[in-house]
From Swiss-Prot:
The lineage of its organism: Bacteria, Bacillati, Bacillota, Bacilli, Bacillales. InterPro entries: CsbD, UPF0337_stress_rsp, YjbJ_sf. It comes from the Bacteria. Residues 1-22 are annotated as: Disordered. Residues 13-22 have a biased composition (Basic and acidic residues). This is UPF0337 protein BC_0999. It comes from Bacillus cereus (strain ATCC 14579 / DSM 31 / CCUG 7414 / JCM 2152 / NBRC 15305 / NCIMB 9373 / NCTC 2599 / NRRL B-3711).
Length: 66
């Protein structure tokens, strides 16, 4: 199991959650900049999470061949 893949997935989930909070606060306060930052953080989090999943699948595949 890829430890770095799992770490990347967790980091991505945290980034997504942070983005959701920022986006929500931006929505309530009508702060477009904060809302857009939140959307960007969510996007980065999603990408990190998917990269982590790919790393983990690759690592698991390599572990099975050994």
């Amino acid at each position: 199991m890829s430890e770095s893949g799992l770490k990347e997935q967790i980091t991505g989930k945290v980034e997504k959650a942070k983005g959701q909070v920022k986006e929500g606060i931006g929505e309530v306060t009508e702060d477009r900049k904060l809302k857009n930052e939140g959307k960007w953080d969510k996007t980065k989090g999603t990408i990190k999470e998917k990269v982590g999943k790919v790393k983990q699948k690759i690592s698991d595949g390599l572990d099975n061949k050994e």
